[in-house]
Amino acid sequence: MAHACLQQVGLKSRSLQIAGSLSHGDKRRLEIAIVLASSAEVILLDEPMAGMSVENVPELVEIIRSLARTHHKTVLIVEHHMDVVLGLADRIAVLNFGELLICDTPEKVIANPTVQNAYLGEVL
């Protein structure tokens, strides 16, 4: 099972490496492989794109998308990069100092004037 999970995230060829010797992006993939091996139905990913090089983000987005769809997992992502969130989420909750501003579809969130003013100026 471990090798199958590593293969799904593109790490099968590195299965004998020590985790500490992996690149930051590969460590993120390893974290997701560990999640795949678990029986958890709900997965929390805290800033999964943090420290990732720009060229590796799309691949990690696809791995996370696969985790949700192929493996029927609910994935809760804490992420500050709205462009990444918009590409992944079915629903988005926007918090401001612990207050829930909105929880809705990506389309409705980006159309919300409060969210546009506070968070999306550079994305839109």
Would you name each region that the model predicts?
Residues 1-124:
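Glycine-rich phosphate-binding loops of nucleotide-dependent enzymes
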